[in-house]
Amino acid sequence: MTNILIVEDEQNLARFLELELTHDNYSVDIEYEGQAGLDKALSNNYDLIILDLMLPNINGLEICRRVRQEQSTPIIIITAKSDTYDKVTGLDYGADDYIVKPFEIEELFARIRAVLRRQPQKDIIDINGIKIDVDAFNVTINGEQLDFTKTEYDLLYLLATNRNRVLQREQILDHVWGYDSEVETNVVDVYIRYLRNKLKPYGKDKTIETVRGVGYVIR
């Protein structure tokens, strides 16, 4: 599912956009202030940001500039500022498109589709709602990034890429810790527990199954 962040201080408009987008099978988060929007944009892995320019705390141009310093997430500016100078400035700050209010929802949807088509397809592994971004080396659930160590990520990636195949502890140890590692096989059980503890708040801890006497598998 495509994850969209809306940063818009007009609450009625923001909620209307959320309703229309979710009806069209997009996942939507809303922030009504600039700082909160910037924080959310930088701490999550969104597919698209819809951004107003005139916001409390931090204006949309500054958010656009800051996001573009760290991410390539596409940004569509929606604003009442219709001067050519404002449009050029917004695009020069890193926005991918610029729409002047008021606008028709059909036009916004068409522009969203066009912007998303221009983005390279991400290499994403989706296991029961657990999304592993192979390019970014991160894991998200419902758009929220989980705090994984490299070893935890490598372990989850190994299980996910061998879905429905039971992996023995020795196999896991060799792939994740290396063939020359002197680590005991019980460390695999410890790290499986770490993974389950981090997945549990999202109801995903049972995604990793124990095959008694053998090892582990993701179905």
Curated annotation (Swiss-Prot):
4-aspartylphosphate modified-residue sites: 52
One of the record's GO cellular component terms: cytosol
A single GO molecular function term of this UniProt record: phosphorelay response regulator activity
Subcellular location, principal: cytoplasm
Cellular localisation: Cytoplasm
Known DNA-binding region: 122-219
Paired cysteines (S-S): none
Modification after translation, per record: Phosphorylated by ArlS.
InterPro entries in the record: CheY-like_superfamily, OmpR/PhoB-type_DNA-bd, Sig_transdc_resp-reg_C-effctor, Sig_transdc_resp-reg_receiver, WalR-like, WH-like_DNA-bd_sf
A Pfam family the protein falls into: Trans_reg_C
PANTHER family, A to Z: REGULATOR OF RPOS
Function field: Member of the two-component regulatory system ArlS/ArlR.
Name by which UniProt lists this protein: Response regulator ArlR
Originating organism: Staphylococcus haemolyticus (strain JCSC1435)
